[in-house]
């Protein structure tokens, strides 16, 4: 309940015309605590509902920033803005390339054709994700501070892999080096994924998903046996182009890009491997990319 409370608090502080109470009933099918942005969905939905109800002309980007502020200042998680941004600016059958430093963004079509996005749920709630997110953020900031003694940069995202390889030795802790390596290499993979989608090169896109998961596992260390089993067993299924964990890690979900004729094979093979390894079954959702938050009249 703190997510709507946070949005309501900040809206009331900013807009004095919100003078009356209201009843809100939430209905949805996003699993809670599954790294599918349920909290950001509640934040943006609540904000959109209240601003519509009270005829407040609030810029969509400001609402997105307010959602992040709820996470940072009301909930106490030092999270980024990606979840709120995609829910605020999502476009049907498109991905978004977002620079979180400048908030500059570009849409790119996701014309997967006969390939579908499958979400694989570990059915294990995230218990460490929020504290570990803050820990990883702090580790990246420590690595950046050491690199800044030799490079004129404001963020790890400004550093190329070639620069990192030349200056990695200045980071005096091996763990911090791996954290920085993940952030920098993931930034490069994201740009490559954007170009692959533009070129309809889904084989390369799938390979980037696989490489991303490997980096999240080995360098950033935010996966765990459940997510690794899902992603790695999915990667072996014929008809799967790629798979990786999604969200904050440690539990929650992974995604796979799979040929529509191989979806049942994916479910069967992954379920068998996951149940044998973890002891219980995962869940699967097959989804399409939809528009962001909107009123029912806009659907």
Question: Whereabouts are the PLM-identified features?
Answer:
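Residue-level recognition of conserved structural "scaffold" positions that shape functional pockets
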Residues: 62, 87, 254-259, 299
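Short, flexible active-site loop motifs that bind/organize anionic cofactors or intermediates
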Residues: 33, 53, 195, 217, ...
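C-terminal nucleotide
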Residues: 94-242, 257-299
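Residues at beta-strand starts and edge strands
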Residues: 20, 24, 114-116, 252
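Gly/Ser-rich oxyanion-binding loop with an adjacent helix/lid
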Residues: 1-110, 262-263
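Glycine/serine-rich anion-binding loops at beta->alpha junctions
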Residues: 29-44, 239-257
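Conserved structured core elements
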Residues: 1, 40, 57, 61-64, ...
